[in-house]
Amino acid sequence: QALLAAGLGERAAARQRLAELLQLKFTTGAATIFPGICRLLPGETLLVERGAITARRRRAALPEGGPVPIGRDAALQRLDAVLLDSVAAHLRADVPYGLFLSGGIDSSALLALMRRASGSRVRALTVGWDGGGEADESFEAARLARAMGAECERLTMTEQDFWTLAPRIAAATDDPTADAAVLPSWMLGRAAASGGLKVTLCGEGADELFGGYSRYRKRRAPWRWLTRPPRARGIFGGAIADGWRDGITAAEAAAGQGRSALQAAQAVDCAEWLPNDLLTKLDRTLMVHGVEGRTPFLDPVVADFAFRLPDARKAGAGFGKRLLRDWLAGAFPEAGAYARKKGFKPPVGAWMAQRADMLGDLAAGHPALAGVLPTARIRAAFADAERSAQPAWSLLFTALWYGAHVLGVPPDGDIGEAL
């Protein structure tokens, strides 16, 4: 946003990048959605002298080579040491800090580690949804906080919050990510700031490094060579023209050398999904409130250890993050390390379904989507929002983002006014 305000970039969106955003929820590589503006890649350093780039260096995020054998007991002992060291380092601050507690494996592990590292009561925040529902784990998060002697503030995101805050949240994410988790993350950032917190610890990175996603388990299946790679079709399938997957294809080509199939899938996620969706979401939704998000699972020592683990200690037997779960079962039994978790996404599908016709009409005529998708497909996505939320949310977020950053629409009104 600063570059655009200074006149150093064009207030336009590259059509190929819009297609990528709709299909993947994020954009890949160095080129941003704004023509002429590029990202520094993770671990990259540029040396600029007299207005020109004279040197470029990049530190590899992940180690080379395949998994390294290690026994379960030795792995658990090593994991405990590297996690505790990382959390202790991430707690170094001269300002108040806290934790975003979702009730899942990752934030529960951080809760236990923060208590050990600091020896003091942890301040945690969690968020639930109006009406609750099976995807609301905020009460479970509050229970875990009590079990660990932590102070926990529970927020509630209502349907009205969705309609009024979504334009402001889209305006805060200059590098766009159509991940519905931007909504609760923004609310948590606002609550942290209003409560005097300047730093929060967050669980991003654990799934990518310890093998948490179901797509990783598929990479270990005997029939994996017969299946399509992750993100093969995109959110809208063949309705969007070819070319949107070029960035992922390039990452796949670079990720697999000398690695297991599971590691290759992890490496692609660490190269694209993690920095361009999850960490972008975290940075923009927190820093707009002046709050710093810290990610202990992404400590280089933790990342090196986790990525080299044998595949069987990451994914298998119906579960991911097996070693992390085994560690949590011993360190924090109340967390239910092998219980099924429900995720951290608000019921945007049900909320959009309440005004599906209005949203479909407004989105179908929006300049952000013109020529990218047929209008009939846009309307169909909103008509089906309650059953399948992501397509409709991707369309809505993209239109809101385009309005704020390209058209200059003020984000102060509700969704209907912003569109």
Task: Enumerate the predicted regions with their spans.
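Cysteine-centered catalytic environments shared across enzyme families
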Residues: Q1-P167, A171-T173, S185, A329-G330, ...
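Short acidic/histidine-rich active-site segments
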Residues: L197-D207, G211-Y213
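Active-site metal-coordination segments of metallo-dependent hydrolases
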Residues: D73, D130-F139, A181, G293-L298, ...
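Conserved acidic
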Residues: G71-L79, E137, P176, A180, ...
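Conserved glycosyltransferase catalytic-site signature
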Residues: R15, S108, S138, A181-W186, ...
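A mobile, often basic/glycine-rich helix-loop segment
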Residues: E208-G234
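Short low-complexity, flexible loop/linker segments enriched in glycine and/or proline
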Residues: P167-A171, S194, R215-K218, W351-Q354
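Adenosyl-5′-phosphate
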Residues: A5-E10, P35-P42, A52-I53, E64-G66, ...
